[in-house]
């Protein structure tokens, strides 16, 4: 419950007996983790409102679901936990509404990639309310009401709060240790705090994002485990250092796998990085072999240096393999064009002779050599303002009906010659 830096002791409270005592240390490792954000909203103390962070929290939610047999639930927050919670509740036959303050789910993705996740979750029956803020909760005899500003309140049987976490750094702060980004515990590359005899690792420790070079909070299990090893090594006199994290992550969302590494467009733009992007939609393995599915890959790289900044992949099969290859390439200093030379395993059930990662490298090389000039969806807005531009969609009528950009005229490619007069 407390650290006495001068005496090099910690105060310990036994949870079973409430007894307290002091324990001395030579070296101390802090791994307090993170705590869920609980906003000060009306109705937060309702027994129908749950937060999810620990294993014990899952037991409480599962017990409540088993006992109360809820038919409806509201999930507040569209990060990892919120999306996973929505899927698991839906698997129990519960109708789920997911409310997210931002205009998209999963902030590690760019909006175009997140839209693929939105469409898939909607197809699974999840109602998404994006760009909406929760104002509070009210208990009713028929359940709990979630108030969303001026919007219609939502009546449900339970509410799951998963709006993010904060580093649990109060113990460190009370001991006078220096804090860093978002009140995380500041550490060096040996995981030492401002007191060299005290180390900090995990979700409460400030680290360097290896793709951006900026200080960051990365609440992922992989980095936390590596930090623990670095701290233990340093205590034992082994001179290893932590190299930072690219925040590589992977997430199951119903039938999709969503993965990312490095930074996204939003972060690159905010940092003033001059970047290029590639979007491709290859098949997970050889197209002539049954069972292949399309994945969408987005690769960001620095325009001048060709340094890979990050990648995002959404698909059904083979997504984790490709994101790991790109994450490894980033750490090894391989450039975007260098992806074309990677010698990756191939057999028709697993990949294609030109692996999707190789294809991204080919595209980067084509851009660098001036063989291709890219045109992105967001560039359409500028074209709409030009009088001499006709926006033409040459897909089939069925493809056009499934979805099209506003302002595009549909003339199928096979009919284009006979209908040229319509373009005057």
Regions found by a protein language model. Give the residues of each.
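Glycine-rich dinucleotide-binding loop and its adjacent helix/turn
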Residues: 30-92, 181-182, 187-189, 409-419
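A short, polar/charged loop-to-alpha-helix boundary motif
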Residues: 317-336
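Rossmann-like dinucleotide-binding cores of NAD(P)H-dependent redox enzymes
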Residues: 72-73, 80-138, 220-224, 240-266
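Hydrophobic beta-strand scaffold positions of dinucleotide-using enzymes
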Residues: 29, 160, 172, 391-393
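Positively charged, proline/Ser/Thr-rich regional signature most characteristic
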Residues: 379-424
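A Rossmann-like FAD-binding core segment of flavoenzymes
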Residues: 1-12, 16, 23, 91-189
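Mid-to-C-terminal Rossmann-like scaffold of FAD/NAD(P)H-dependent oxidoreductases
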Residues: 204-317, 351-352, 356-385, 389
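FAD-site-proximal beta/loop scaffold in flavoenzymes
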Residues: 45-69, 143-147, 151-233, 325, ...
């Amino acid at each position: 419950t407390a650290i006495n830096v001068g005496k090099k002791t910690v105060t310990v409270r036994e949870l079973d007996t409430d007894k307290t005592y002091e324990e001395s240390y030579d070296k101390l490792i802090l791994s307090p983790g993170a705590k869920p954000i609980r906003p000060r909203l009306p109705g937060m103390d309702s027994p129908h409102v749950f937060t999810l962070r620990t294993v014990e929290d899952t037991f409480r939610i599962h017990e409540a679901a088993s006992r109360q047999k809820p038919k409806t639930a509201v999930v507040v927050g569209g990060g990892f936990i919120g999306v996973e919670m929505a899927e698991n509740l839906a698997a129990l036959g519960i109708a789920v509404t997911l409310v997210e303050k931002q205009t998209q789910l999963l902030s590690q993705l760019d909006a175009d990639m997140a839209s693929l996740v939105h469409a898939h979750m909607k197809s699974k029956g999840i109602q998404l309310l994006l760009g909406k803020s929760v104002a509070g909760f009210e208990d009713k005899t028929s359940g709990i009401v979630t108030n969303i500003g001026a919007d219609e309140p939502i009546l449900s049987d339970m509410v799951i709060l998963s709006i993010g976490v904060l580093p649990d750094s109060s113990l460190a702060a009370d001991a006078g240790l220096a804090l860093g980004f978002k009140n995380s515990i500041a550490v060096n590359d040996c995981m030492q705090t401002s007191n060299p005899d005290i180390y900090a690792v995990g979700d409460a420790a400030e680290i360097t994002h290896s793709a951006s070079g900026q200080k960051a909070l990365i609440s992922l299990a992989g980095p936390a485990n590596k930090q623990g090893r670095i701290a233990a090594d340093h205590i034992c006199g082994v001179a290893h250092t932590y190299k930072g994290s690219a925040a590589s992550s992977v997430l199951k969302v119903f039938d999709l796998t969503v993965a990312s590494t490095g930074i996204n467009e939003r972060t690159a733009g905010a940092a003033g990085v001059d970047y290029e992007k590639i979007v491709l939609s290859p098949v997970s393995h050889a197209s002539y072999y049954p069972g292949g599915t399309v994945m969408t890959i987005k690769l960001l790289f620095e325009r001048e240096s060709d340094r890979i900044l990050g990648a995002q992949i959404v698909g059904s099969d083979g997504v984790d393999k490709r994101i790991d290859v790109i994450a490894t390439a980033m750490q090894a200093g391989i450039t975007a064009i260098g992806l074309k030379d990677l010698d990756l395993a191939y057999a028709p059930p697993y990949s294609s002779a030109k692996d999707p990662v190789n294809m991204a490298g080919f595209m980067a090389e084509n851009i660098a050599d001036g063989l291709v000039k890219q045109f992105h969806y967001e560039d359409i807005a500028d074209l709409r303002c030009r009088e001499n531009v006709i926006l033409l969609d040459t897909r089939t009528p069925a493809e056009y009906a499934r979805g099209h950009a506003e302002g595009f005229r549909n003339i199928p490619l096979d009919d284009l010659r006979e209908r040229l007069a319509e373009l005057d």
